[in-house]
Regions:
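Short, low-complexity N-terminal intrinsically disordered segments enriched in polar/charged residues
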Residues: 18-47, 51, 55, 149-154
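Surface-exposed, charged secondary-structure patches
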Residues: 22, 62-63, 71-120
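Residue-level detector of flexible, active-site-proximal loop/helix-junction positions
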Residues: 11, 64, 142
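N-terminal, post-signal-peptide region of Sec/Tat-exported proteins
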Residues: 42-82
Length: 155
């Protein structure tokens, strides 16, 4: 009986370790998709950007015009890939190319991640599509402009 319990414990422990390793593997793959997206942008590498995206991707930002009207700015996967190929973030100095990726949640074939970039923050929804993690939605927002210190007046 004791041997049976020990065997059961070993099998149960091994399955828990396997599940944890799989989740870590998914987290690594999600992080890689996010890095393909942001590093592809900074490097103007359209192929890398395209690899990170689902073809039906929607990238959106909430904008407010000067009259206070709200608008939803949108970009498709192909529009983003084309813009990446044309210029991307090549004009952003290397030292400003922030790319902090955090995987926020994974459940089945769905995941959420956050990228803190040079002047903006991206919230990504990813899906495990045909065995690969790809970005299907991006909601982004510009970081606030840095506050400048008030100038002192000289007399």
């Amino acid at each position: 009986m004791r041997k049976l319990l020990m065997l059961l414990f070993v099998v149960l422990f091994a399955s828990v370790v396997h599940v944890h390793a799989q989740a870590k593997s998914d987290a690594d793959l999600i992080r890689q998709a996010a890095l393909d997206y942001i590093e592809g942008w900074y490097e103007a590498d359209g192929a890398r950007m395209e690899r990170a995206l689902h073809p039906d991707l929607a990238k959106r930002i909430v904008r407010v015009d000067p009259r206070g009207r709200y608008m939803l700015g949108q970009m498709s996967a192909m529009g983003l890939v084309q813009l990446t190929r044309e210029e991307g973030g090549k004009n952003i100095p290397k030292e400003k190319q922030q790319k902090d990726v955090t995987v926020l949640d994974i459940f089945g074939n769905a995941a959420t991640a956050k990228i803190i970039a040079a002047d903006w923050i991206d919230y990504l929804h990813l899906a495990k599509w045909k065995g690969r993690w790809v970005i299907v939605n991006v909601l982004w927002e510009n970081k606030p402009a840095p506050q400048q210190a008030p100038r002192s007046s000289s007399n």
